[in-house]
Each structure stands twice: as structure tokens, then as C-alpha cells.
A protein has these predicted regions:
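Conserved acidic, metal-coordinating active-site core of Asp-based
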Residues: 99-220
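Short, structured coil segments at secondary-structure junctions
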Residues: 62, 70, 176-178, 232-233, ...
């Protein structure tokens, strides 16, 4: 019997306007009545995730958890300090940062465990994309030495052409990404986490902590950085606007897009039939 549904945020649980469709809210409230946990799982920081969910009825997240930084951290809802956290070595982040400076036209986000997000070479278009759901601090120059003793969780490159980001990934010196898990998201991000850290590892860690069989979990997503979670869960569901690579490894592609509210189909196809 399904006990937990984990979902990506952007372009999956949230519509393209970064709002939660009412259909998702109604479906989650019914899921909670049936005893199923709702767990947001995002590449974003915990605080950014909670800000996007601030208008949800409290019952949606009561007693639940949040997987952030692509599995790098797990928080209890309402607690800023993570109960599970991975750390990315400063030297690795600095190496990637220096390469971004060398390239010249690549932007970068650097995420601290405390939830601060530092941006380098950020365009106005990127600021507009992030407006209302992520607060970005702009780096003061071409150095991140001031972050040397700050616990870091992940970083990513920003470029608004995913094909060119894929080309960049293929042509980069392998030493730059040694010891890292990499993925792509939102049509604009090339993401870096410590090896073994992804949304799938985060879901497995949370399920184990809660004593839930991974087969009794459902994951929802739309893009490459969701694929490990889609494969780890008992059922992997993608929205109709999912990328082809995510669709290919999913168990079920919903008719609903992120703007419609995919949780209605999750509820009707997988959860309610077990309670009849």
C-alpha cells in the first residue's frame, strides 16, 4: 500500500507560473486523509521550497519532510536544520566556479547548507525566472574565497540553452566533475552534487528512516534531475510536459501537465484504488 508520494517542484507540482494548481491541493488533502505522506523533493533550498508552499493548507505538510538540494538535505517540515545533509568540498566548487569565470558566458548558483544561494554572472532573464520563489545573493566579484569555511551543498551552471549545456558537459575536462553526480533541469541548469547524491538517494534515505518500503512510494517529476527518484520509487509518474528522457524511464505518463495538477491522476490511479 502506497504510503508516501514525493514530487519535484518546478514544472511538476508547480505550474509554469510557480503557483500550486488547486487540483493538486485538493488531491493532497484527500491523500493525507488516507494516511499518505506528501514530500516535496527539489534541487532548491529548503527555505525556497517552503516559501513556494506557504499558502498550502497546514494539513498538506503536517508531520512531513522535505528533500532539498537534489537529495543533499532532508528536513522535517518546520525545522530549518536538516536531519540529513551532504557536503560538497569547497575545492570542488571553486574549481567549477573558476571554469565558469574562464568560459565567460556561463552563470552559476552556489548553495550553502544554511540556505543561502550565491549567484555569479546572472542575467536579468534569470532573475525574472527566479522572481518570487528564490532569493539570490549576487557574488561581489570573481572569487568565492569568502565561502571557504562555509558548508556547501551543491552548485550549478546556468545557461538558457539546454543543448549548449549538454555540449558543455561533453567537452569539459573530466577532472572538473570527478567525484560528482551531474544532471540537468528546467531547460537551463547543469547541476552538480557529491557522487551518490540525487533525488533517488534522498527518497531511499527518507523511506528507510521512516520504515517505509521503497516499493510503497510514488515519485512525480518532469526532467533529468528527477530520473533517479522516478526509478527508485515503486511507481514513477511524469507530467505530460516531461522531457523525453524522463518519460522513457517512467511507469506512467499523466494526461495532466504541471499547470493542470498531476496529483489528481496519482490519487485516482494509484492511491484510492487501494482504499476501496
Amino acid at each position: 500500500m502506497y504510503q508516501l508520494v514525493a514530487t519535484d517542484m518546478d514544472e511538476t507540482f508547480l505550474g509554469h507560473d510557480h503557483a500550486v494548481p488547486q487540483a493538486n491541493i485538493d488531491a493532497i488533502l484527500r491523500m493525507r486523509e488516507l494516511g499518505v505522506l506528501f514530500v516535496p523533493a527539489s534541487g532548491r533550498a529548503y527555505g525556497s521550497i517552503m516559501n513556494s508552499l506557504r499558502n498550502l493548507p497546514p494539513a498538506c505538510l503536517e508531520g512531513s519532510y522535505v528533500i532539498s538540494y537534489n537529495g543533499g538535505c532532508i528536513n522535517r517540515v518546520g525545522e530549518d536544520k536538516p536531519i540529513i545533509a551532504s557536503r560538497m568540498p569547497f575545492e570542488v566548487v571553486e574549481r567549477l566556479f573558476n571554469h565558469a569565470v574562464f568560459l565567460g558566458d556561463i552563470g552559476m548558483h552556489i548553495y550553502t547548507q544554511a540556505g543561502d544561494i550565491w549567484g555569479y554572472n546572472i542575467t536579468q532573464s534569470e532573475l525574472d525566472y527566479l522572481a518570487g520563489h528564490m532569493d539570490l545573493k549576487i557574488l561581489p566579484g570573481d572569487s568565492i574565497e569568502f565561502l571557504r569555511d562555509v558548508p556547501l551543498s551543491k552548485c550549478l551552471y546556468v545557461y538558457e540553452n539546454l543543448d549548449l549545456l549538454h555540449e558543455l558537459a561533453l567537452t569539459m575536462d573530466p577532472a572538473l566533475t570527478e567525484g560528482l553526480s551531474t544532471t540537468f533541469s528546467s531547460g537551463r541548469y547543469y547541476e552538480f552534487n557529491p557522487t551518490g547524491v540525487d533525488k533517488g538517494s534522498g527518497l531511499r534515505a527518507l523511506a528507510e528512516m521512516l520504515g517505509i518500503d521503497i516499493a510503497d512510494t510514488i515519485a512525480c517529476g518532469d526532467s533529468a534531475n528527477d530520473m533517479a527518484m522516478l526509478e527508485a520509487a515503486g511507481v514513477g509518474v511524469v507530467v505530460s510536459n516531461a522531457t523525453p528522457d524522463a518519460v522513457a524511464i517512467s511507469d506512467y505518463q499523466a494526461k495532466a501537465s504541471c499547470d493542470d495538477g498531476v496529483f489528481v491522476e496519482v490519487l485516482e490511479h494509484f492511491i484510492e484504488p487501494e482504499h476501496r
